[in-house]
Regions:
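S-adenosylmethionine/decaboxylated-SAM
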Residues: 1-185
Length: 185
């Protein structure tokens, strides 16, 4: 429900989803897109093109960093402005890769946009909102560390927080491997 609500709140025209896997986030973004007539662009290394039947959904099977360089041309070929209203990042969870994603994709963000990052609090064992436990893996703070470097600050990802950093409202939920939402101020 959080992904849907965050996306709907900006009345998006273009939602970019980096990392599809089983399509859970695609499902939420597709429903948000239907309300505003937005296009959803999903990028993944694996073939995930059966995840949606939404007519304005496009799947690209490619490395998301490589595709970022082709994004303006892709937008032109689809009669879209290369301005992202919602950027969702849920890919490798590795520091260097996430840092590159932020560097390559953030310049395409619209004036009023959101960036949503999943797995910003990865541990070997994690706690869900219902207090049950799940098994994860320690990614050496990959996603949150890349975000810290991008915004020039430090975060305690083990705790929920709301703060302002480098022109962004930053909201973070620590449970279930962490979810962090940036909203441009």
């Amino acid at each position: 429900m959080t992904l849907f609500a965050e996306a709907v709140s900006v009345h998006p025209r273009l939602i970019v989803e980096l990392g599809v896997r089983g399509g859970e986030s695609t499902f939420a973004f597709e429903r948000a897109a239907r309300l505003s007539g937005a296009h959803v662009l999903s990028v993944d290394l694996e073939d995930c093109q059966v995840q949606s039947s939404y007519p304005k959904w496009t799947f690209v099977k490619q490395n998301d960093i490589t595709f970022a360089g082709e994004f303006p041309e892709w937008c032109a070929s689809h009669q879209l402005s290369p301005e992202i209203d919602v950027l969702f990042i849920d890919t490798s969870h590795l520091y260097e890769h996430t840092l590159e994603e932020l560097r390559f994709w953030m310049p395409y963000l619209a004036a009023r946009s959101k960036v949503i990052l999943h797995d910003t609090n990865m541990k070997r064992v994690y706690r869900r909102a219902d207090r049950s436990l799940g098994m994860g893996w320690d990614n050496d703070r990959g996603v949150i560390r890349a975000l810290e470097e991008t915004l020039g600050t430090k975060f305690n990802e083990a705790q929920d927080f709301v703060t302002v950093a480098d022109g962004w409202l930053v909201r973070h939920w620590a449970h279930c491997n962490g979810l962090t939402v940036l909203e441009r101020l």
